[in-house]
Amino acid sequence: MKDFTLILAIIAIAILALISCSSSKKTQADTRSDVALAPQTIVPDTFVLPLIPEVLTDPGERAAYLLSHFWDRFDFSDRELIQRPEITEQAFVDYINILPSVSREEGDRSLMYTLGKAASDTMFYRHFATLFEKYFYDPNSPFRNEEYYLPLLQQFVQSPLLQEEVVSRYAFQLDMALKNRIGQKSNDFHYTLESGLTFSLYELQSEYTLLMFSNPGCPTCEAVMAQLNSSKPLNDALAMNTTSRTMLAILNLYPDEDITAWFSYLPQMPARWINAYDKEMEITRKKLYDIKAIPTLYLLDKEKKVILKDTSIEAIESFFSVVH
């Protein structure tokens, strides 16, 4: 992992150097002309970055140009490159590493451009679909990004280049990804406490709700619970709770069916949290939330709209550090 991080750091430095350059005194008309004439020759058996016109001096414009021409010199007719991850997959990782440098609209246009390039060959299209799934959807991917993945899924489910069973998988992913999106109201569900009392998420009155799906005894869950429980930004928010106003409620929900294990583990859960289980397995039965891995974290506002979806502890702490 350290080697992988080092590689990404080197890539980032190289890309920063690529998209930055000295100023130019050419007019806007000259710039448009020179950009239009920039040659992009396909180079076989390797990956070569596109030539960025020197007249583009703004780093944002250079990044946008790079993303909109990233694959222009790549030979999509050579299927042997699919079996060369040191070329194709490495170039793909370089590509998605640049996406945050531009606006979401420009990023989406670039993603569609990439799919269009890959669609020139069925096997390449399928390979790129797999890479997008691996890097944007896999819960363990450092590039995981549902907002980038959504427009791709919308294309995959309509593509005649993918096998029927693959389209079905992407259709399911699309259905789940469209639920509980950032800015939208989260799905309601019922949770049951140790006492046997049952409430709904929407009944929970708090300025913010940290929703955590976890399993008893799960090592990763234990680590996340410990980190959340000792988090200064979260503890500062919890300290603002009063009898008349709740700033932050942490709802730690067990979504599975081994209630005996949950009760056994309950004494180890933070007492200040709302520790509960899904008695009727409602979340699983109705597919209310996309729980790709355990634990999964959501941050909701007062109206139960999603602020952060399937997020990290760092993002949650950053939010409360700014807000409070």
Q: What function would you assign to each model-found segment?
A:
Residues L18-S20:
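C-terminal motif of bacterial Sec signal peptides marking the signal peptidase cleavage site
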Residues S23-L197:
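Oxidative protein folding and maturation machinery
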Residues M1-L8:
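Bacterial N-terminal signal peptides that target proteins for export
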Residues S200-S230, A249-L251:
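Short active-site neighborhood of thiol/selenol oxidoreductases, capturing the structured segment around
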Residues M225-P267, M281-R285:
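Structural microenvironment flanking redox-active thiols in thiol-disulfide oxidoreductases
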Residues A293-T296, K302-H324:
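Non-catalytic, surface beta->alpha helical segment in thiol-disulfide oxidoreductase systems
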Residues H190-T209, L234, M240:
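A short beta-strand-turn-helix
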Residues F263-Y298, K302:
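Short, internal strand/loop/helix patches
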